């Protein structure tokens, strides 16, 4: 019997097959990866959208701050012009400035001999010309409105408040600046 000793004995039952390890992804792993990538991209898109919106708001607020400061400077210019023109007692330092308690606009492009620079506020929008100057002359309309309110609490003081209003993506915004001007002459 040794004659067949080189023959391997057959094992009874199932013999395991040699299976190589699979290197691909399962369907579940693929779906999880797609979900993670989608959530990440949505987060990035949301951050970009908010950044663009806040950049627009910041730009508008900066413009509003400059327009408010310009409104105060216009009122200061009228007061200083009154001083320089050596107004008489009948034409005081605050001439042309005391009729704005309900609100005025500063139309410095208005030309007449009396130069009524402060006119009644009626919700007018500022316009911008080709050089970037804001005024009420017929140019390109903007989203900004400027309202100048001047109160005279006593003989030697004017309280100047400038409100800038605008709307951004359907939401109203405003910016205010205040200054006290005195008859220090």
What is each of the regions a protein language model found here?
Residues 18, 27, 34-37, 58, ...:
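N-terminal hydrophobic or amphipathic segments with adjacent small-residue motifs
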Residues 66-185:
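Low-complexity, Gly/Pro-rich coil/beta segments used as flexible assembly/activation regions
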Residues 25-69:
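Aliphatic-rich helix starts adjacent to a transmembrane/signal segment
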Residues 1-25:
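N-terminal leader/signal peptides at the extreme start of proteins
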Residues 8, 21, 41, 48-51, ...:
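Ubiquitous "structural anchor" signal
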Residues 19, 30, 46-49, 108, ...:
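Residues at secondary-structure transition points
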Residues 14, 22-25, 29, 97, ...:
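Intrinsically disordered/low-complexity terminal segments and short unstructured peptides
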């Amino acid at each position: 019997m040794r004659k067949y000793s080189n023959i391997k004995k057959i094992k009874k039952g199932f013999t395991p097959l040699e299976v190589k390890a699979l290197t691909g992804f399962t369907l579940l792993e693929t779906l999880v990866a797609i979900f993670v990538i989608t959530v990440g991209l949505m987060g990035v898109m949301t951050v970009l959208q908010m950044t663009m919106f806040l950049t627009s708001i910041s730009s508008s607020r900066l413009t509003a701050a400059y327009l408010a400061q310009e409104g105060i400077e216009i009122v200061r210019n009228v007061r200083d012009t009154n001083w320089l023109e050596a107004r008489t007692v009948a034409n005081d330092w605050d001439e042309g400035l005391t009729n704005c308690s309900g609100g005025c606009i500063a139309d410095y492009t208005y030309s007449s001999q009396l130069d009524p620079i402060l006119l009644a506020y009626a919700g007018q929008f500022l316009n911008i010309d080709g050089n970037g100057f804001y005024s009420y002359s017929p140019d390109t309309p903007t989203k900004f409105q400027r309202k100048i309110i001047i109160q005279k609490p006593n003989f030697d003081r004017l309280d100047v408040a400038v409100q800038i209003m605008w709307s951004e993506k359907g939401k109203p915004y405003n910016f205010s600046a205040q200054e006290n001007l005195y008859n220090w002459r």
